[in-house]
Amino acid sequence: FKVRLLTTGEYEIEEQAYETLENQLVGQIPISKFFDAKAGVRFDTPEGPDRTYALLGIAGLAPQWFEVDANLYVSKDGDSSAEIDAEYELLFTNYWILSATLDATVAFSEDEEIGVGKGLVSTETGLRLRYDLIDRAFSPYVGVVHERKYGDTADLAKAEGGGTEDWFAVIGARIAF
C-alpha cells in the first residue's frame, strides 16, 4: 500500500496566475503485477469555483511499456467525469528521456460554471524532453503540448470568447521522493 500526493498546474504568464491547479491525494494497492487500484480525493482550483471530487481508478504498465492512468471522478454536487492518460517513454540515454503523452477527458454531466460540457471534453497530446538528475528524483523538462476542446465544452469556450484549440510550450520539473 502506498499513499501519493500528485499535483499539476498551468500557469498563465500574461495573467500572472494559475489557470488550473489540480491536487490529488490517493492510496494505491497492487491488484496485479503491473497494475494498482487507487482511491482518494482530488481538489481543483480552476478559473471559477473550486471543485472537490472523490476518485477511483487504476494505474499501471500496459503491454508495450505504456504507462496508463484511468480515473473516475464524482463531485460533491454529483457531477461525474472520467479521464485516461497514456504515456510512453523513449530513452535516448539513461538520463535523457523523451515522453509522449495523450490525455482524454469525458464528462457524464455538464458543469457550466467551470466550462465543462457533457461528452468528450478535451484531449491533450504532448512531448517532453527531460534530464534525470539525482537518482531520477529530480528531472527538469521542456516540451510542447497541443490541447483541443470538443462538443459542448468547445461551444461553451466559444461563447466565453475563448478558443477550442491551442499549442503551449511547457517547462517544469518532475519530482519524486
What spans do the regions from the language model cover?
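Membrane-embedded beta-strands that build the outer-membrane beta-barrel scaffold
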Residues: 5-7, 27, 37-41, 58, ...
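Outer-membrane beta-barrel proteins
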Residues: 16-19, 48-50, 79-81, 97, ...
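Residue-level signature of outer-membrane beta-barrel architecture
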Residues: 1, 27-29, 43, 60, ...
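Outer-membrane beta-barrel domain signature
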Residues: 10-16, 42-47, 71-75, 112-118, ...
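Hydrophobic, well-structured mid-protein blocks that either form specific transmembrane helices
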Residues: 40-88
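Residues that define the transmembrane beta-barrel architecture of outer-membrane proteins
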Residues: 19-23, 50-54, 78-82, 119-125, ...
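Transmembrane beta-strand segments that form the barrel wall of outer-membrane beta-barrel proteins
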Residues: 1-13, 35-45, 65-76, 100-110
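Outer-membrane beta-barrel "beta-signal"
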Residues: 127-133, 163-177
